[in-house]
UniProtKB/Swiss-Prot annotation:
This is Guanylate kinase. The keyword Kinase applies. Disulfide bonds: none annotated. It catalyses: GMP + ATP = GDP + ADP. NCBIfam families: guanyl_kin. Keywords: ATP-binding, Cytoplasm, Kinase, Nucleotide-binding, Transferase. PANTHER family: GUANYLATE KINASE, GUANYLATE KINASE-RELATED. Residues 3-181 form the Guanylate kinase-like domain.
Length: 204
């Protein structure tokens, strides 16, 4: 059975990565795809763990070579997902999660219409700005640039299947877990996963 592709997007500072990481710690059936980026790593980030960090020139070479399943320019830096991180895993029956922006999500949905997409919103603009400043990872210039892009990013929430409001962290994690569980219980999924049982039950 082919795996399920999940897409999670949010405006910068919404807590997307924290929610995704906490959810995947509880759910070992989904693999997080590691994205490529042309930006410099932050102090707490590690190559091949948080991102594959490459130069802007190398990223452009990968674009020209057709290596990316999706890619986009996000806050003046390139980000993208390699084909090899997605298609082989899905074909092998593994569920894959892409943590990407709305531009990349739109590209992915055009290629895989049945991908399940989730958008995370903050409880308020003030909370979003507070989180961006508290994480202490970006300069004031970068924070201002990210805040300026917030409205456009959040305006795309209605392109996604599910919306989670990250007001209380544990609630948001539980809601994401519930989406994954509900996906596995869909009739078309259960029909394939339990084909022998269903065939036996329905045989006169």
């Amino acid at each position: 059975m082919r795996g399920t592709l999940y897409i999670v997007s949010a405006a910068s500072g919404t807590g997307k990565s924290s929610i995704v990481n906490a959810t995947l710690e509880r759910d070992q059936q989904i693999a997080l795809s590691i994205s490529f980026t042309s930006r410099q790593p932050r102090p707490n980030e590690r190559h091949a763990q948080h991102y594959y960090f490459v130069s802007a020139d190398e990223f452009q070479r990968m674009i020209e070579a057709g290596d990316f399943f999706e890619y986009a320019l996000v806050h003046d830096d390139w980000k993208g997902t390699a084909h090899q991180s997605v298609e082989p895993q899905l074909a092998a029956g593994h569920d894959v999660l892409l943590e990407i922006d709305w531009q990349g999500a739109r590209q992915v949905r055009n290629k895989i219409p049945d991908a399940i997409s989730i958008f995370i919103l903050p409880p308020s603009r003030a909370a979003l700005e507070e989180r961006l400043r508290k994480r202490g990872q970006d300069s004031e210039e970068v924070i201002h640039r990210r805040l300026a892009a917030v409205h456009e990013e959040m305006a795309h929430y209605d392109e996604f299947d599910y919306t989670i409001i990250n007001e209380h962290f544990e609630t948001a994690v539980s809601e994401m877990s519930a989406i994954f569980t509900a996906s596995r219980l869909r009739r078309q999924t259960q029909k394939v996963r339990h084909a022998n049982l269903i065939r036996t039950l329905l045989t006169p």
